[in-house]
C-alpha cells in the first residue's frame, strides 16, 4: 500500500479488525519511510455498478460519494459514525444484490431517503431538500406534511 503522505511503498500493517458489521476489514498502517499513520478499509466488491444520471450520463458508483452525501444530511445530528457506516453498507448491499449493472441515480436517492427516514427525520428532510430540489419554504412544508401523513399510515398499518 502506497503512503498517502510521502508516496512510499514501504508501509506495514499494525492492526487489523472487522468493521462495518463484519463487511469490511479496517487496517491501521504505518509508513516506514516517513512514519505517518493511516487507515485503510478492505471490502468485497460483488460487481461494478454504473449509476445513470438524470441527464443520461453514466459514472462508476462511488461509495465515498454516497457516504459524504449522508454525512452532509446528518451534520450536527446525534447519529454516530458506526450507524452511518451500517447505513451505507446496507444501501451498497441492496444495490449489489439487485443484479443490475446499471442503476438509475433516482434508485440510489430513494434508498438513501428510506434509510435516513428510519434513522433521523431531520437528516431525511435535509437530504430530500437537495434530492427533490426544493425551491422555497413551501416545498419543505409540503414534504413534511406528506411525510407526516405517511408516518400516520405506517402507524395504522402496524409498521
UniProtKB/Swiss-Prot annotation:
Query: Which Gene Ontology biological process is one annotated for this entry?
Result: negative regulation of DNA-templated transcription
User: So which cofactors does this thing need?
Assistant: Zn(2+)
State where the unnamed zinc fingers lie.
3-34
Coiled coil (UniProt feature): none
- Report the GO molecular function annotations: ATP binding; DNA binding; zinc ion binding
The alphabetized UniProt keywords are: ATP-binding, DNA-binding, Metal-binding, Nucleotide-binding, Repressor, Transcription, Transcription regulation, Zinc, Zinc-finger
Note the superkingdom of the native organism: Bacteria
Q: How is the cofactor bound?
A: Binds 1 zinc ion.
Q: Provide the ATP-cone domain boundaries.
A: 49-139
Task: State the InterPro entries in the record.
Answer: ATP-cone_dom, NrdR-like_N, RNR_NrdR-like
Q: Does the keyword Hydrolase apply?
A: no
Q: Which PANTHER family match?
A: TRANSCRIPTIONAL REPRESSOR NRDR (PTHR30455:SF2)
**What protein family is recorded?**
Belongs to the NrdR family.
- Role of this protein: Negatively regulates transcription of bacterial ribonucleotide reductase nrd genes and operons by binding to NrdR-boxes.
Task: Kindly provide the name given to this protein in its UniProt entry.
Answer: Transcriptional repressor NrdR
Amino acid at each position: 500500500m502506497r503512503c498517502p503522505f510521502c508516496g512510499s511503498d514501504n508501509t506495514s500493517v499494525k492492526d487489523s479488525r472487522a468493521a462495518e458489521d463484519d463487511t469490511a476489514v479496517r487496517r491501521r498502517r504505518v509508513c516506514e519511510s516517513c512514519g505517518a499513520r493511516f487507515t485503510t478499509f478492505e471490502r468485497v466488491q460483488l460487481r461494478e455498478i454504473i449509476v445513470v444520471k438524470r441527464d443520461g450520463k453514466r459514472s462508476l458508483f462511488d461509495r465515498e460519494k454516497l457516504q459524504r452525501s449522508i454525512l452532509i444530511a446528518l451534520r450536527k445530528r446525534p447519529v454516530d459514525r458506526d450507524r452511518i457506516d451500517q447505513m451505507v453498507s446496507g444501501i451498497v448491499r441492496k444495490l449489489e444484490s439487485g443484479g443490475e449493472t446499471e442503476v438509475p441515480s433516482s434508485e440510489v436517492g430513494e434508498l438513501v431517503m428510506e434509510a435516513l427516514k428510519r434513522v433521523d427525520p431531520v437528516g431525511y428532510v435535509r437530504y430530500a431538500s437537495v434530492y427533490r430540489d426544493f425551491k422555497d419554504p413551501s416545498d419543505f412544508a409540503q414534504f413534511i406534511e406528506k411525510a407526516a401523513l405517511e408516518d400516520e399510515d405506517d402507524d395504522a398499518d402496524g409498521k
